[in-house]
Every structure is written in C-alpha cells, then in structure tokens.
Swiss-Prot record:
Residues 1-30, 47-66, 157-206, 342-396, 527-751, 763-798, 915-992 are annotated as: Disordered. This is Disks large-associated protein 4. Keywords: Membrane, Methylation, Phosphoprotein. Pfam families: GKAP (PF03359). It comes from Homo sapiens. InterPro entries: SAPAP (IPR005026).
C-alpha cells in the first residue's frame, strides 16, 4: 500500500506514461475501451486478435482517469525511480491520449463519481506493504500472471462482456475523449497531490487515496454487479471469475512469500504476452486484474510475516490449500451488490459508506483494515504494522494449542465474537492474512474452527504447556479436516455466510464486548479472554480474566504485561469482620475500604470495567490480608481476582479449579457473579453509614450492661492506639465508643497507658505546656481509668448516641473524674505542707469541681432521666441534652485547667513558678520611671503595665474559651451532620 506515495502525480505526466502503440498496433480503438460499461463488449468476439501483453495493463491504468484506477500500487512510488524502470518509451503516451475517445472519458466523468464519503475513516499503515511496492516491473509481472490465469483458466468468461451495463450504456463510448483528456489529467494532478500530502503527513495512506481512484471502477457496475467484478456485470462468469482469481491468489501465495517477492508463481504460461488474453477486456479486466493482484500482494506479504514466524501454520495452510481456494471463492462471492456485502464485512461504522460503494474484500480483511477499524480504539492496537516474530509466534502457539478441538463446537457467533479477543491477543495490528482471514472464513463455513480455537476453557492451563508440541501434528490434521469440511460446505452456506456476525470481527473491541455482554456469552468466551489476557497463565492474570472476559482483554492488551500480583503490602488491616479487635484498625479499614470500594465497585454493582480495575489495581485492600475469615469464600486472598468491599473473591491458584471457576467467570459474571460479592460484602459499609439509626433500639439494651469505667477505658485504649497528642474529639470518641465487645477485655491491661492519657486530658486546655510529664500525673486508680477522655470529648459520644443513657454515662464519667481529682488534691494537701497560695489554688479547684458536680451535674442528670422517661411532660430531646452538655463542658474545662495547674505545681514540688505574665508585670514598671520622673506619670505607667498584663491575661482566657466553644460547637454540629459517619460507624458495627 506504499504505492500511493509522493510521486503519484508523476506517472500521469507524458514523460513517465508508457507508450501503448507497440502494444496495440493491430487495433484502432479496441484496447481503449476503458469504460467499465463497455469493457467486455468484444471480449468473446476478438479472443485472439488483440492480445494484451502483460505490460499493457500499466499503460491502461495511466490513461484511465484517476477516479477509475483500481490498482493503487501501480502508481509510481517515491521509493522507485520510475523513468529507469519504465519499460516503455515515454513518447507514446501522447499518441495514446490522442486516440482515446472523448466520449469514453466523458462517460468516466459521469459514471465514475468519486465517493469519498465512507472511506475517510479507513486508514492503513503506509509501511505495511513492503513487499508490495517492490517495483513496477514486479507488479506488472504479477498482474500479468494473474491475468493469464484468468483468461487461460476461464476462457468462457469473456462471452458475457457485452452484458456490462453499469450506470450507462455503451452508446457513445468512443466519441469525445480527446477534448477531455487534458482536463482529467489536470484534475488528477490537482486532486492527487492533495491526497498525497495528507498521506505523507500522517504516515498512513488513507483508503481515500486508493478508493477515490478506484471508486469509479467499483461503482460503475451498479448495485447488481458482483463484489470484485469491478464494473463487470458478467452474471454468468462471475462465480468462476472469483473462484479462479482467488484460487490463483490463495493457491500460490504460500510460494510467493519465501523469496519476499510479490510475484505469483503461476503455472500458466510465462510472462510473455499471452495470446489467450482477449484484448477487449483490457479496460475492465485491467481493473479487475489489478484488484486481484492487489489482494494477492496483500496476502502474500501478510503470509510472509506468518511464514517467517512459524512454519506450522504454513503447513496446515498448505494442506488446506483447497480450502483456501474454496474459501476465497466462497468468501468473496457475495451475491448482490455492495450493500449486502458491506453489511457482512464492514463494521457498523462503515456500513453506510459501504452501502454506497463497496470496498475491496481483501482490503477489508487485511490486517491493515482491521488496524484502521481499531484506529479509533487505538489503545488496543499495537503501533507496529508488522508483528514481531515473538508476538507472531505466540499467536501461532495460541492457534496450534487451541486448534485441537476443531470441529467439536459450532457456534459461529461466539467464534466471531472471539475474534475480537483474538485480534487483541497480540500487538501486531498487521496480522498475517492467513492467521486472521483463514480462521474467519473457516468459521464462516465451519463455524467450529474459531469457537474451538478460542472456546475451550480446558485449554487454558495448557496454553503454553509442553503438550502443544505433541499436539501439533494432529492439530494440523484436524485443521485440514476442518478446512475440507468448510470447503464442502462453502457453496451451500454462501448465503448463510452473509448472516454471520462478521461485523464483530472488524468491529472495535469495545462494541463487541458490549454486544457480548448483551448476548450473555458463556464460558467458551471466557477462555478466550483468559488466553488473551496474558499468554503465560499466571494465576493473577487467570483470575482476572476469569471474571472479566472481554474487558479484561481490552485492558490487558493495553497493559501488555499480565496483571501485577496482589499488592499485599498496602495496609496491615487487622480484621474486616464485625468482631474487629481495634477501633483504630476499623477506622483505617473503613476509610480505605470506603474509598477503594467506591473506586472499584460503586453502588455495589461491578461493571466489567470496575471489576477489571479491582482485579488489576485495587486488590490491595482485600489482598492485604484483610479478607475476613467469615466472609471470604476462599481462604487464599493472595491472588484475589476481585476486590469487593470487604470480602475477596479469591481466585484459586491451582489450575484444576480454574475450569469450574470459568463457568462463573463468563461475561455474565461481570454482571452477575461479581455483583453478588460487592453486594454481600459491601453491605457492612452501607450499613455503617445508616447504622446510627438502625441500631438504636438494640443499642439501648446492649450498652447499659457495660460499665462506664469500661467504656472510658476503651476511650483510653483507642486513644493510645491513635496516640494523638491533643485529643481530637472527632477522632478519639469514634474510636472509643464503638467497642462494648472489647471493653471488658481491654479494661484491665490498659491501665499503664492511662497515665499518658490522663496527662493529655489534663493538659487539654493548654496542651502546649512542655512541663507536663507522665510522672507528674496521678497513679492510674480505678477512677482514673475513665478519665482518659478529655473534658471536651464527652460531647463526641453524643455523636454516637445522643440519648439519656449516653449522657448519663458521660456525666458519671466526668463526675468520677472530678471526684478523683478532688480526692487526689485532698491527699496532697494533707501529705505536703503547701504554701497558702498553692493551698488556695487547690481549694479553689476542688471547691469549683464540687460545686459543679453538686449543682449543674445534678440538673443535667435530671434532664437525662426525663429524656429516658417517655411519660415526662417536658421531655427534653437529645438535642437539648447535647446543648446542655456543651455548656457543662465549658465549666468542666475551666476546672480541668485549674487541676492542670495544680499538677504542674506538684511536678514542680509545689513551688510556684513565675509565669511570663508576672515577669512582664515586674519588668515593665521599671522602664517608665527613669524616663520621666514627672509626678503622676510613673503611677500611670505602672497602672498601664498592670492593665496591659491583665488585658493580656483576659484576652488569652477569652481566646481559649472561644476556641473551646468553637470546638464544642464543632463537635455538636459534627455529631448531627453527615460528617459524623466515621464517628458512629465503628460503634454501630460492633453493636451489630
């Protein structure tokens, strides 16, 4: 396909166009019947008179207007020096043009419109046909051989030449060409350079480049003409014409590729001018022969690739040469016009365009066409037009390994669907024609071929096993048998062939995948996707593909290496089950689970892409050892195929299990089998979010049984786990509240950490004080176990359960904490001789604490009891309790600050430490005195200094209180807003 290169317009010039006088000396105008409508008018009448030598083809192509040129590679390529290789003197072109009938060119202009519409999307890699563009001489020889084969094998084909009546009649075919030739040449020169530049820029040659030139030749035959007759209406000869043409091609293409040439080794006469070629067929036969040879070039070059990589398939193809011939005949002989053919061979995107003007069959089936079809989905398509030997060999191994069961199944639709996966198996987007087309045509005739090639789930573990060498011989035999049976059925199933879902073969992968899901494909397809995922069946790839048949093909092809094994190092989650041992572990698990589960399977449904992502990327959550024993159906999460929210659908690592799993893993599984897993196991997550409401009644019955101290103990436990220097109430309480189960267990052993916890609690007000140390804190008495939660935190439990029970527990905890502090301070006063100032502070703190407990705490207790009493007339709501509790918090914080100061004093051996404020007071008064000894000013300055210190103290206190109020308000609002899900989720979970 390179031949549409830069110098395409050059061959239109007179200097390069070969002469035709010596070739057509005996005829006046017959050789120039180029119009397809009258191409074969005298074919039978002058069989021997005007022999068209092989090189006559080339001149005719030059004299045709560009729209009717059907052999793209006859155009001189920039790679070739045409003047040296052109065997014809350049002078004769003028005479030929002068002799060309004007009416003929007029008919061309009328009857051969340029249809650019449908073909702009078909772009083929320019570098794909290295063997095709070798040299014009080689091409001419190739065309000669094909033409000789046509006319020697099918002499009866010429009789119907007169029947050609494409769009017009033969009436004035010869009358006004002289005046038009210059215009057509100018149009060609003007139009083709544009296409050439586009082709050069893109590096692809668009089908526009050739099909524009060839559209006329194809369309001129009208809708009734055969697929490849190129304007011939020869009803009687069309089937044999196809058969011979493509018998020639398919029969000999295996021989041509060994020497890397495009010549056909044609048994008929050598390339001398054949006397058997009727000259009047030149115009249209030239087109047809050129098309046939073009296809042959495609086939031979593609097969060259195949042959280089593996000889096994070549052998099987050689054995089934007869099948090739039958297939060529059968596959190309599409009854009716381009419409029916286009519906069969075109992808849905191209069908409209093809309905107007057919595209050459072989081009459609060539790897370049598939490349063009996959161009929009170029993610899957490999860039290189020619497959590397390794990839091609791998493909061969696939074919060999899977062909053993040829003929056992017959589901053409499935087999053709599988072709999408087949095409994705390897990055080679120029697959050899035998590899792609032969299986397709086999499946057309004997649909079992492809379905067997890619439909055997049991073959998967053996894909690259040692058995494939053992099976090669019988595989080739079976392949031959299948091909023969296909050939026998070729004629009978010609019409049926059109009904097969061939578009799936050329359709973009995503379309076929969607169609496969809709069709509910079964396990045979899964095996294909499994194969296509990654040739070496590593367990990870197997598990992935098992559940994600086609989409896994897509992604796996994009990411050529097989899926990475599970990332077990993601997070050391402790447990996923309801009995998770640590709140913090649950929190981390929930966070990661929620995020990842949202990524992979949102809404509990796993479409194939989601499940694919989960199998390839996010498996870290479930694979990180989180798979809960009660929920994970299969123990080894090492190769989890799917990540569901909490459980893993672990794929067994043993191949024997792979087969039964494959049944589950059909595309249906992507919608069905995977779906249950996310729905079963994410259910805890969904429950978590609504659990605060769901568990309300159960909570009342279960929670009161746990002592307050034990709950406070869990507070401290989880706070230890979190180890937050400042008790973020949003963090510690979600941790602390949820674990009635672990409370009784944890209460005893966790007392030692309580000291640090209490320290933090005490220093909550001014956490920044570095002097506070664990040693300075009171011993972990039983009442201290509950004191781990800082005064600000009790509002947070309300987040979990804001009812009378909860607030009563909080109140009792605070009461015990304050009482403990008071008792501790009483002991200290008795044991130590404290200064009056220190003693005053102790008495102040203890008195305020006792006052708070005796008045406000009692009032709040009454409110809680009213809330719990359904008969209470002014029954306070949970909101009321929360608000009152927030007010209590301010008082509790003040008292806590006082006790903090006392503990600082205790750590300092009850020695008062000058605070920075006092130092400021002392330092500030002296400066004003020396400045101005005015009478009143020193006093004023002292007053200012003291006032400034007082203001600073008050402002600091105000800021602190404001910050605390803001924190309490934040806590209060957080408990009532959706942000508090994290707070009550773990608790609700444990209660469940």
């Amino acid at each position: 396909m390179k031949g549409l290169g830069d110098s395409r317009p050059r061959h239109l010039s007179d200097s390069l166009d070969p002469p035709h006088e010596p070739l057509f000396a005996g005829t006046d105008r017959n050789p120039y019947l180029l119009s397809p409508t009258e191409a074969f008018a005298r074919e039978a009448r002058f069989p021997g008179q005007n022999t068209l030598p092989g090189d006559g083809l080339f001149p005719l192509n030059n004299q045709l207007p560009p729209p009717s040129s059907t052999f793209p590679r006859i155009h001189y390529n920039s790679h070739f020096e045409v003047p040296e290789e052109s065997p014809f003197p350049s002078h004769a072109q003028a005479t030929k043009i002068n002799r060309l009938p004007a009416n003929l060119l007029d008919q061309f202009e009328k009857q051969l419109p340029i249809h650019r519409d449908g073909f702009s999307t078909l772009q083929f890699p320019r570098g794909e046909a290295k063997a095709r563009g070798e040299s014009p001489g080689r091409i001419r020889h190739l065309v000669h051989s094909v033409q000789r084969l046509f006319f020697t094998k099918a002499p009866s084909l010429e009789g119907t030449a007169g029947k050609v009546g494409g769009n017009g009649s033969k009436k004035g075919g010869m009358e006004d060409g002289k005046g038009r030739r210059a215009k057509s040449k100018e149009r060609a020169k003007a139009g083709e350079p544009k296409r050439r530049s586009r082709s050069n820029i893109s590096g692809w040659w668009s089908s526009d480049d050739n099909l524009d030139g060839e559209a006329g030749a194809f369309r001129s035959s009208g809708p009734a003409s055969g697929l490849m007759t190129l304007g011939r209406q020869a009803e009687r000869s069309q089937p044999r014409y196809f058969m011979h043409a493509y018998n020639t091609i398919s029969g000999h293409m295996l021989k041509t590729t060994k020497n890397n040439t495009t010549e056909l080794t044609a048994p008929p006469p050598p390339p001398a001018p054949p006397a058997t070629c009727p000259s009047l067929g030149v115009g249209t036969d030239t087109n047809y022969v050129k098309r046939g040879s073009w296809s042959t070039l495609t086939l031979s070059h593609a097969h060259e690739v195949c042959q280089k990589t593996s000889a096994t398939l070549d052998k099987s193809l050689l054995k089934s040469k007869s099948c090739h011939q039958g297939l060529a005949y059968h596959y190309l002989q599409v009854p009716g016009g381009g419409g029916e053919w286009s519906t069969t061979l075109l992808s849905p995107r191209e069908t409209d365009a093809a309905a107007e003007g057919p595209i050459p069959c072989r081009r459609m089936r060539s790897g370049s066409y598939i490349k063009a079809m996959g161009d929009e989905d170029s993610d899957e398509s490999g860039g290189s037009p020619k497959p590397s030997p390794k990839t091609a060999a791998r493909r061969q191994s696939y074919l060999r390994a899977t062909q053993q069961s040829l003929g056992e199944q017959s589901n053409p639709r499935r087999s053709l669907d599988r072709l999408d996966s087949v095409d994705m198996l390897l990055p080679s987007k120029c697959p050899s024609w035998e590899e792609d087309y032969t299986p397709v045509s086999d499946s057309l005739n004997d649909s079992s071929c492809i379905s067997q090639i890619f439909g055997q789930a049991s073959l998967i573990p053996q894909l690259f096993g040692h058995e494939q060498q053992v099976r090669e011989a019988e595989l080739s035999d079976q392949y031959e048998a299948a091909c023969e049976s296909a050939c026998s059925e070729a004629e009978s199933t010609a019409a049926e062939t059109l009904d097969l879902p061939l578009p799936s073969y050329f359709r973009s992968r995503s379309h076929s995948y969607l169609r496969a899901i809709q069709a509910g494909c079964s396990q045979e397809e899964d095996s294909v996707s499994l194969q296509s995922l990654s040739p070496p069946p590593s367990t990870g790839s197997l598990s992935n593909s098992r559940t994600l048949p086609s989409s896994s093909c897509l992604v796996a092809y994009k990411k050529t290496p097989p899926p990475v094994p599970p990332r077990t190092t993601s997070k050391p989650f402790i447990s996923v089950t309801v009995q998770s041992s640590t709140e913090s572990a649950q929190d981390t698990y929930l966070d990661s689970q929620d995020h990842k589960s949202e990524v992979t399977s949102q809404s509990g449904l796993s479409n194939s892409s989601d499940s694919l992502d989960s199998s390839t990327r996010p498996p870290s959550v479930t694979r990180g050892g989180v798979a809960p024993a009660p929920e994970a159906p299969e123990p080894p999460p090492k190769h989890a195929a799917l990540k569901s929210e909490q459980g893993t659908l672990t794929s067994s690592e043993s191949h024997p299990e792979a087969a039964p799993k494959r049944k589950l893993s059909s595309i249906g599984i992507q919608v069905d089998c995977i779906q249950p897993v996310p729905k079963e196991e994410p259910s805890p997550a969904t429950k978590f979010q609504s659990i605060g409401v769901q568990v309300e009644d159960d909570w009342r019955s279960s929670v009161p049984s746990h002592s307050m101290s034990s709950r406070r103990d869990t507070d401290s436990d989880t706070q230890d786990a979190n180890d937050s220097s400042c008790k973020s109430s949003e963090r510690s309480l979600p941790d602390c509240t949820p674990h009635p189960n672990s409370i009784s267990i944890d209460a005893g052993p966790r007392q030692a950490p309580k000291i640090a916890q209490i320290k933090r609690n005490l220093s909550y007000g001014d956490n920044s004080d570095p002097a506070l140390e664990a040693s300075s804190l009171p011993p972990p008495d039983p009442w201290l176990e509950t004191s781990s939660s800082s005064p600000a935190e009790p509002a947070q439990p309300g987040a979990c359960r804001r009812d009378g029970y909860w607030f009563l527990k909080l109140l009792q905890a605070e009461t015990e904490r304050l009482e403990g502090w008071c008792c501790q301070m009483d002991k200290e006063t008795k044991e130590n001789n404290l200064s009056e100032e220190v003693l005053g502070k102790v008495l102040s703190a203890v008195g305020s604490a006792q006052l708070l407990m005796s008045q406000k705490f009692q009032q709040f207790r009454g409110l809680c009891e009213q809330n719990l009493n359904p008969d209470a007339n002014p029954r306070p709501t949970a909101q009321d309790l929360a608000g009152f509790w927030d007010l209590l918090q301010l008082s509790i914080e003040d008292i806590s600050m006082k006790f903090d100061e006392l503990y600082h004093l205790k750590a300092n051996s009850w020695q008062l430490v000058e605070t920075p404020e006092k130092r400021k007071e002392e330092k500030k008064p002296p400066p004003p005195v020396p400045k101005k000894p005015a009478k009143s000013k020193p006093a004023v300055s002292r007053d200012k200094a003291s006032d400034a210190s007082d203001k600073q103290r008050q402002e600091a206190r105000k800021r602190l209180l404001a910050a605390k109020r803001a924190a309490s308000v934040r806590q209060n609002s957080a408990t009532e807003s959706a942000d508090s899900i994290e707070i009550y989720v773990p608790e609700a979970q444990t209660r469940l």
